[in-house]
Structures are given as C-alpha cells and as structure tokens.
From Swiss-Prot:
Part of the 50S ribosomal subunit. Belongs to the universal ribosomal protein uL1 family. GO terms for cellular component: cytosolic large ribosomal subunit. It comes from the Bacteria. Binds directly to 23S rRNA. The L1 stalk is quite mobile in the ribosome, and is involved in E site tRNA release. Protein L1 is also a translational repressor protein, it controls the translation of the L11 operon by binding to its mRNA. InterPro entries: Ribosom_uL1_bac-type, Ribosomal_uL1, Ribosomal_uL1-like, Ribosomal_uL1/biogenesis, Ribosomal_uL1_3-a/b-sand, Ribosomal_uL1_CS. The gene is rplA. Pfam families: Ribosomal_L1 (PF00687). Coiled coil: none annotated. HAMAP family: Ribosomal_uL1_B. NCBIfam families: rplA_bact (TIGR01169). Keywords: Repressor, Ribonucleoprotein, Ribosomal protein, RNA-binding, rRNA-binding, Translation regulation, tRNA-binding. This is Large ribosomal subunit protein uL1. Disulfide bonds: none annotated. The lineage of its organism: Bacteria, Pseudomonadati, Pseudomonadota, Betaproteobacteria, Neisseriales.
C-alpha cells in the first residue's frame, strides 16, 4: 500500500492542480506518469455541450485511428455466402450465421467487435440481451451493420474505436498506449476530435467542446486547454 501512495504522490507532483495544459504537453505528462509494469492505455474524455437526455443530441460513431490502438482486436462476423468468404479474407476471427448465434448463447464470446450484414440482423436481434450489455450489439451508426462486411473487418483490425456520449454528455475513448510516440498519440487524438466535432448535433447550442482531459490506466488525469486543440 505504501508503494502505491508513494507512486501517487510522485504523479501528483508532476501535474499542477487546476492548470490547463496544451494538448502536446498533456500527452507528454501522461506518458511520463505511466509507470505501471504494463503498457497502460492512454485515454481521453471530451465533456460536450449536449443534452444526452434528448435523442437528437446523443453522439455515437466510430473512427479509425491512423496509428492504431496498440491492441489486437478479435472480430466476429454474422454473414453468409460470398460475404462470409470476404470477411475471412479480410481477417475476421470468427464468421458464421445460426451456428455463431448458438456459440454465443452457449457463452462463447471471445471477441471484441461484432459485425453483421443486414440480412443477418434477424438472427443477431435475438442476441440483444447478451450482446447489448457488453457493448457488442452491431449498429449501422457505428458501421458494424453493413453490406460491406470485409471493409468493416479491415477497419476494426486497423484500429477503429467507437465513441458515444454517456448520460452526462461525456465521450470516453482510448487513443493508444503509453509506449506510443507522443506524435502518434497526438495524431490519434486529432482524428478522434475531428470525428466528434463533425458529429456535432444541429440542436446543440452554446459551447460544444467544454472540457478535455487525457489520462492513462493507472495515472492521473491531465486537463487540456481547449484552445490548444484544433476544433
């Protein structure tokens, strides 16, 4: 316990409370503070000026990070026929139809992303109570229900991340690992920010990008000066 306290004390000393840092400096501080014995993820949160209680202000989508996520993504695809072969060639880990649904009902969910062709949704829809709570339910808004399953598989494997506002209007997402170069994390950050800015609801009023923070799995959060990001 003493080691944890000492580590946290060192981390806190490197970040000034209530100070807003330029995004480049924030990323550098987070990398420096990521001293755990594993490769910590680097995460970002965007506090947006939206009312998530209103359906027309819920932001949801996906974006392929140019430098990837630093993790291996296992992809399952519900499809059949030529689409099944295309999905396999694109790198899907599991491809099936009724047989895949049976495996999932049996508790076999060894994958991170589920993709489905439109014709498969009659089967996938029956798995809502299993896939939904795990955030695995395919959705056309994030590109996981699509006739072009091969492209969706390639995107997932290339480092696609999904984002969605929570009840407080905050988007949480991972932009890489602490082992990434600062420039690579910044490039991923910019790609995610660009997607979120483009997704701004027409009904959203006032300041859209209210607060931004960057953190690592075991480190402290660093608040970002929103004027330092290109929005």
């Amino acid at each position: 316990m003493a080691k944890v306290s000492k580590r946290l004390k060192v981390l806190r000393s490197s970040v000034e409370a209530n100070k807003l840092y330029a995004i480049d400096e924030a990323i550098a501080l987070v990398k420096k503070a990521a001293t755990a014995k594993f490769d910590e993820s680097v995460d970002v949160s965007f506090n947006l000026g939206v009312d998530s209680r209103k359906s027309d202000q819920v932001i949801r989508g996906s974006v392929v990070l140019p430098k990837g996520t630093g993790k291996t993504t296992r992809v399952a695809v519900f499809t059949q026929g030529v689409n099944a072969e295309a999905a396999k060639e694109a790198g899907a880990d599991v491809v099936g139809f009724e047989d895949l649904a049976a495996e999932i009902k049996a508790g076999n969910l060894n994958f991170d992303v589920v993709i489905a062709s439109p014709d498969a949704m009659r089967i996938v829809g029956q798995l809502g109570t299993i896939l939904g709570p795990r955030g695995l339910m395919p959705n056309p808004k994030i590109g996981t229900v699509t006739p072009n399953v091969a492209e969706a598989v390639k995107n997932a494997k290339a480092g696609q991340v999904q984002y969605r506002t929570d009840k407080a209007g905050i988007v949480h997402a991972t932009i890489g690992r602490a082992s990434f170069a600062e420039a690579d994390l910044k490039e991923n950050f910019d790609a995610l920010l660009d997607a979120i800015v483009k997704a701004k609801p027409a009904a959203a009023k006032g300041q859209y990008l209210k607060k931004v923070a960057v953190s690592s799995t075991m480190g402290l959060g660093v608040r970002v000066d929103t004027s330092s990001v290109n929005n």
